[in-house]
Curated annotation (Swiss-Prot):
GO terms for cellular component: attachment organelle membrane; cell projection; plasma membrane. This is Cytadherence high molecular weight protein 3. GO terms for biological process: adhesion of symbiont to microvasculature. It comes from Mycoplasma genitalium (strain ATCC 33530 / DSM 19775 / NCTC 10195 / G37) (Mycoplasmoides genitalium). Residues 220-241 are annotated as: Disordered. The keyword Membrane applies. The keyword Cell membrane applies.
Length: 599
């Protein structure tokens, strides 16, 4: 196999490896090549032993020739099972099957066999065939696994007392020729001659003795183990003065083993004493604690007079508690007032919404009285009205017939006597409008106002030639107008129509720059080509045409709260708002969020 073929196989292997790892991440796959150097991803069914090609998703024949990727060695999927003759625990000759791949023994029936007591024909235990890392049948010796505590002294706290511990360790240890350890042993020597009382006062010896015991056992490591083990190998204890001279003295150590065995049992005896001494130390620590307790008892004594003063403080805030609801009540009253005025302030500058806001007020006041007045007037005054004033009507445009009735002194006197106020608008049986006036000037003013109300005349024609009761408010005399800032110019100026165009800017108007007095091109308004026709709220932000804003800032269903609207969550949106022009350019660009602004 040349390098070119190897490179081709390696490229195909890397490509197949990514594909198989993505599709079968949890399957153990064997990669091999056939005699045509085509790479295969192979999987063997553990139960049936059949071989499958994962990339082709089909089963391969058992004798299909397969080779390793980088060599000509054939790959065999047959189990490596060897038959052995062995002797069981009763010394009977048995045939055993050894699976070299799985490293297990089986009997003739295919069951896993425990070969702990089996030997082969050469009397070699069958356990030796198994690797100790894969089976638990063979117990590893300590030589196979060095202990974690190698090179450290074994301190058995509970099994034997300290006296026996030190005698065994020190007899094996070598004598301290340079007497370096004697300086460490000095704190122990005065304890032999001291009594318990004198020893208790120091309170330090337990910690000194623990350090002394650890340091005193250091020479054991030099001789008991191999000479390579020293304190340089132990992580925690590295006293340099003890270690290095001990290594230098090793040849002379053997001559004085018995000299130091005798004095050190004397040191052992006080080591038994610190155990009760430690108990005394704990008792000494307990004694000052009750001395602190009376101090703790005195603290609540100081608190008791403080508790007496607390109710006096409670008496003072009681009137304060009474004042709090009084202060809260005007706050609660003021909040709904602010909420009521906020929508009214927003609605008034909108010309479209002015009419529906003003109209409902006179409905409740005058409609029931209008219905009651014809009962008094119809019988006496109808024939006179029709004969005298019908040929004089000057309103042919809208099909709306208006009849002017002069007031008679007798009728006014009869109504004043009964305490009944006459109304200005009356409904007749012929669905006509009767306007009663007291002077010729007011008559001309009312007719002038009616002539210029094209919207109201269209509504009257669409509703069977009858003006709706909600529109009567515009026919009242000036002294009964609803006081709004639109009342005078709205009905007296004949040059202005009632559409929203009266309040809107010119459609082609674009504000000049405040810097160089230059009017930008209309193309700067491509984000919203009705930017200059923002209705009645030309906010400062609208002078920056490239900023995206909702297309109708102030006019979103202001005649009704869109939160309470039954269609607020539906996809249906009104195509035309009341009293708005169909040419205002805004309607052609519907908003994506028509009602979301209310939230």
């Amino acid at each position: 196999m040349n390098d070119k073929q190897k490179a081709k196989i390696n490229k195909a292997y890397n490509k197949l490896l990514k594909k198989i790892n993505k599709r079968y991440p949890d399957v153990s796959v064997v990669y091999a090549r056939d005699h045509k150097n085509k790479v295969h991803a192979l999987y063997q069914d553990p139960e049936s032993g059949n071989i499958f090609s994962l990339e082709k998703r089909k089963q391969l024949a058992s004798n299909y020739p397969l080779f390793e990727l980088t060599s000509d060695n054939p790959i065999s999927f047959t189990n490596n099972i060897v038959s052995l003759n062995a002797y069981d625990d009763k010394n009977n000759l048995v045939t055993v099957q050894y699976d070299q791949d799985n490293n297990t023994f089986y009997d003739q029936n295919g069951n896993v066999l425990d070969v702990s007591s089996y030997t082969d024909e050469k009397k070699v235990p069958l356990i030796n065939y198994l690797s100790s890392t894969q089976t638990s049948q063979e117990q590893p010796t300590q030589q196979d696994y060095p202990s974690i505590d190698a090179g450290l002294p074994k301190i058995e706290v509970d099994d034997q007392p300290k006296a026996a511990q030190h005698t065994t360790l020190e007899t094996e240890s070598e004598p301290d020729v340079f007497e370096l350890n004697d300086s460490l042993n000095q704190p122990q020597q005065p304890t032999e001659n001291l009594g318990d009382d004198q020893f208790v006062e120091k309170e330090v010896p337990p910690t000194q003795q623990l350090h002394q015991d650890l340091v005193h056992q250091q020479p054991v490591q030099v001789d008991s183990g191999s000479q390579n083990h020293s304190f340089n190998n132990s992580p925690s204890l590295k006293p340099p003065l003890v270690n290095k001279p001990a290594k230098l003295v090793q040849p002379e150590v053997k001559h004085i083993p018995q000299v130091e065995v005798q004095p050190k049992p004397q040191i052992v005896e006080p080591k038994i004493e610190p155990k009760p001494e430690v108990k005394h130390v704990s008792h000494v620590e307990i004694q000052p604690k009750p001395e602190v307790k009376p101090v703790v008892d005195s603290v609540p004594e100081v608190k008791q007079p403080e508790v007496k003063h607390v109710p006096h403080v409670e008496v003072q805030p009681k009137p304060v508690v009474d004042l709090k609801p009084q202060r809260i009540e005007p706050r609660i009253e003021s909040k709904p007032e602010v909420i009521k005025h906020i929508p009214q302030v927003e609605v008034q500058p909108k010309a479209q919404m002015v009419e529906p806001r003003i109209e409902p007020k006179p409905e409740t006041k005058y409609i029931p009285q209008v219905e009651s007045t014809p009962q008094v007037e119809v019988h006496h005054w109808k024939p006179e009205v029709k004969t005298e004033y019908q040929p004089q009507q000057p309103l042919p445009t809208s099909g709306l017939q208006i009849k002017v009735v002069p007031r008679s002194a007798a009728l006014l006197q009869s109504k004043l006597d009964t305490g009944f106020q006459p109304r200005q608008v009356e409904r007749t049986t012929d669905s006509d409008i009767t306007v009663s006036v007291s002077s010729h000037a007011s008559l001309l003013e009312k007719i002038n106002a009616l002539n210029h109300q094209r919207i109201m005349s269209d509504i009257a024609l669409k509703s069977d030639n009858t003006i709706k009761s909600s529109n009567f408010s515009r026919f009242y005399p000036e002294n009964e107008y609803v006081a709004t800032k639109y009342s005078d110019p709205l009905y007296s100026d004949t040059n202005q129509s009632l559409t929203s165009d009266r309040f809107s800017l010119d459609f082609d108007y674009t504000p000049k720059s405040r810097v160089n007095n230059y009017t930008p091109l209309r193309s700067t308004n491509f984000q919203n080509n009705a930017i200059s026709n923002y209705r009645f709220s030309r906010t400062p932000s609208s002078y920056y045409p490239l900023t995206r804003r909702p297309w109708r800032l102030t006019n979103i269903s202001s005649y009704r709260s869109s939160f309470h609207s039954p269609t607020r969550l539906s996809s249906f949106r009104r195509t035309s708002l009341p009293f708005s022009s169909s040419y205002d350019g805004l309607r052609r660009y519907p908003s994506r969020s028509y009602w979301s602004k209310d939230f």
